[in-house]
Amino acid sequence: MTEKLYDVDSTLQEFDCKVVGLYRVDDTTLGVETDRTAFFPEGGGQTSDRGAFFVDAVTPAIHVENVQIDTEHLLHFVENSEENVKSLKIGTLLHGKIDWKKRFSDMQQHSGEHILSGIVHRLYGFNNVGFHLSAQEVTVDFDGELTENDICKVESLVNETIWQNLEIHAWYPSETDLLAITYRSKKEIDGPLRLVEIPSVDICACCAPHVRRTGEIGLLRVVQAERHRGGTRLWILCGARAMEDAAAKLKENHKVGVLLSAKQTETFAAVQRLKEKNAALSFALVGTQRELLALRAKTVTPQTALVEQIDADGTLLRDYADLLADKADAFAAVFSAGDDMKFVIISKHGFALAPVAETLRSTFGAKCGGRGGVLQGALCGAFDAVRATLETIAKQGGRAQ
């Protein structure tokens, strides 16, 4: 099995190694096995390292995009090309270089998660039952419900721990020593067990590289939380990711403050005032629209079917259709503006609307339903075509030809 240099030194960025195996994974991928590596393989909820191998100063870099491990092999996945097959013969000496920016960020996230999980377990007895670390997000699942106050308290304690700059120690205890150690573990582990300890905070079984001291994490922020399978899922960001997220949100908050002429610490109150003002204006607008539609309905000439389109939706559609239905022998149909038209159809004189619904579904793909002389739903289509179809149905007593 490949010697795992990342187990010994998580800060090792470059190393020398020798090719001991080359495998065709599929048509596009080769698996390179070396005698030693600093590349961390995917595992423990964390994506693998990336980087490159170098044969010499002339040969182009061989990019490593993924690293996988099983009970027998640790393979670095590279492009299955003729050049790489020639360059990676058994015995070839390579110089490896990992993507340090990704590695260090991953270590910040993972070490921060250990502190978080240790504190949650100590305070509330909840277990970490799920962890996912990728370039897009970091999630931690606990088997108990954390309140907003709980999360704020935990976040504060995590950052206090980070700023104490405690040493993080990783080692493989003997089977005898292991019997006397209490540690966290999400699953049973076959083979040698590696423990990661943060003094007085957490001891957890873990295969991944970690920062050397908690101070290197910098900062942990819980950016989202939700109930999940009877417990709690937290989204966290640490270190550079936390700083970038905070900077982006601060920038957006600044823009909002400028638009609303509000201080950055008062944007919520400013938005709340704007929302209340908008709600009042919307309420007044609906009232005005309702009055105008009532006046409009008085000018409509009675017909077999009245089919109209208005720039409104919701209760206004129904209210206007109800007014028009008094003047329609068959029914009144009112549609909203736009391509995705909402509609309400009302019959007050016994005209059956089931055939109307059937025709709208088959001709225009409408999604609709109703009862008691009322049909409502939505469809996509040209209003003129819909109106012509409905007028034909009304004239023919319920069927369109």
Provide a role label for each language-model segment.
Residues 1-401:
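A glycine- and charged-residue-rich anion-binding loop/surface
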